[in-house]
Amino acid sequence: MERVIVYIDGFNLYFGICDKGWRRYLWLDLPALATRLLTPGQQLVATKYFTARVRADPGKIRRQSTYLQALEARGGLTIHYGRYQERTKQCHSCHAAWTEYEEKMSDVRLASELLRDAYSDRYDSALIVSADADLQPPIEMIRLDHPLKRVVAAFPPARDSYHLRGIAHEYFRLGRARLSKSQLPPAIKKADGFLLRRPVEWQ
């Protein structure tokens, strides 16, 4: 069997789904989605999800926290965290200042795991759910140093990358069917009995 690890760029997938107007598909069962991306003769070795905890917006914090707890309760994946970095910006005209947050390190962690797993021979094929062109260099390294390994790019909805199309062995786009069939149950019970419910904004 061909060993496959699926690497999911959380924010690239999230914003692609939102830009497509498909928020009802955000309650994703990621291991189930990863399984649906396999072809006959392939075996899912691991599902790795890369994200960062959002800041500033209470609604987004609540929804993300519920979702991450639901994923952890279901199991079947590992979650790798980057961080949100605070930046102060200033208007050049009126000199007003405000705080913005930008996500850092998620793509670096994904690239690092992708390379580490290749050099440790943990997969035969890597399937990357992302259209982030910054992933081109690690894919180039894998193709150079591990010519028998394959890297496949699965572009989230409303996302594309000329650079990844040029360097990945194969690429395809995630469509509505796979997303709609890979939803978590409406409510998930944690080990302590607490029920995590799908956010109303995602229904």
Which residues make up each language-model segment?
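Domain-level signal for Mg2+-assisted phosphodiester chemistry and nucleotide/NA-binding surfaces
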Residues: 1-101, 149-150
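Nuclease catalytic cores that cleave nucleic-acid phosphodiester bonds
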Residues: 78-203
